[in-house]
């Protein structure tokens, strides 16, 4: 992850595809790269963004993990576009369990992620009710995982934002358990 550049620092001289190439020259690392179902905010177009992902994969990336999204259809369309573009690595969906809708909206605005109207309505009136927000957010994330699973997705990436409890509870509810808890 590049992170946010300091103001006035200009564009980077090196890109992710360059880093993948360099790493593959050192050793056969297992490399995941970023992908953007709703297009990277700095991309000139959806096609340019897709070609950038293709360059990263052609350089040796083993898989792509997407930016978080809330519209499952945007991920499915993106996955189809990847296949059509000859991108033959797994496209792992990034799931952001929302416990703070205002914060999620801020993240979404910065990253070109659309928040569906139905989702905003689900959080409406919950500004002062953190527990209910967590339940709503967990249910949305679980529904997304269930739909994506039915569409053939096997692996998921959860954005925990350094708060793993909610993702742990989601995984537990979906039947994903650590080996120590299944014996």
Task: Show which residues each predicted segment covers.
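Active-site mouth loops of central-metabolism enzymes
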Residues: 30-48, 125-139
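A structural motif corresponding to the C-terminal end of an alpha-helix
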Residues: 22-29, 59, 144-155
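Active-site-adjacent beta->alpha loops and helix N-cap segments on the catalytic face
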Residues: 1-23, 43-48, 68-83, 163-169, ...
